[in-house]
Amino acid sequence: IEWVTKSLEAGKHVLCEKPLGLNAIETAAMFDTAARNGRLLIEAVWGRWHPRFARMVQLVTAGAIGDIEHIETAFTFTSEMTDNYRLNPSMGGGALLDVGCYQAHAWVALTKGAADFSITELARTVGPTGIDLTTDVNVRINNNVTAHAVSSFALPSKQQFIVSGTR
């Protein structure tokens, strides 16, 4: 947060490695600083600019599947990590902050940036360092779209993205 804030206040646009912040308060403070200084702040989530993802967002937001009803996502892999920043809570470790961000970014893109999330169900498996090895979450987006996301360092490899609509 310190270097992002200093860079924004120095008039720089910032592309920050994920996770952007460790919690909503830190993240909001950085976005407030960006807005006050007229600077762009982006979390470095590579999938957001992938041509396949951009095309999916274009088709869905143009109504190709009607109104979005449900989004089903998974980003999971098994790992033998023992000494890695992903296991350190003070460095933004955990499956949710490491790979769950891809799913949340997709929800925002598909809802044209107006995503209001409400968690309806949450389950997680916590590892020995206190980080989540697996997080399984159900959410309601903008009160009309349901979504389910699984993020994990402990489940077999799966990268899935399914969007269901009224058509």
What does each model-found stretch correspond to?
Residues 2, 29, 55-58, 105-106, ...:
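Alpha-helical elements of Rossmann-like donor-binding domains used by nucleotide-donor carbohydrate transfer enzymes
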Residues 2, 25, 51, 129-130, ...:
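Residues that form or flank phosphate/diphosphate-binding pockets in enzymes
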Residues 2-48, 63:
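Beta-strand-loop-alpha-helix segment that lines the small-molecule cofactor/substrate pocket
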Residues 8, 67, 131-133:
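Residue-level preference for beta-strand/loop junctions
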Residues 20, 45-47, 74-79, 153, ...:
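Short, flexible active-site-adjacent loop segments at beta-strand->alpha-helix junctions, enriched
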Residues 47-121, 125-127:
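Predominantly a Rossmann-like dinucleotide-binding segment in NAD(P)-dependent oxidoreductases
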Residues 104-167:
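Contiguous beta-strand/loop segments that form the cofactor/metal-binding neighborhood of enzyme cores
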